[in-house]
């Protein structure tokens, strides 16, 4: 039977990734989350902007101690762009990568190679990002106690974002002279996000004297508003069925 909702499709994407069938997974992802030149409030779109010298922009980030970068979990391009930032930012002393989906094994300490494990590492581009960091002597930290919130039956979103910020704060305070890149999904890295207080805002509240910047690299990736039409496209044109 045809897919009835997006959860069924996301479940299939997860299964394909677990089986190593990344080509089929990517085909579905690229149909479900198409790129679109989204309009801004002033009526402009991405097509109206002129190219910039990215090296000049990266130099401006040198004044910050913490850079928050968000990931679009089902859109692999966001990992490539983050890898690009990582490559340049390490030259400015950002030698600590804190990643979502990886739980810390030892409190406040960088993970050893054999300790790096997590759900998103099943996706090749996420693994590529972590592999690059390890090979370039960038410390990997986990900060995500996702399942702790589920097991305690708390408000999962509020619990998770606040706990992420608590763990990041602890890592930063133990390494006060270091610089950090925090890689988190979707709106977790924002300062405000609809009616949810995200990790980025908690972190700013917890570290008021620390210079923090949030880079939203996903603004022009078409998001949830277009997913229902994408669902129809998947069912009608690709003839996809549930397992």
Residues of each region from the PLM?
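Compositional signal for N-terminal targeting/processing segments
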Residues: 1-243
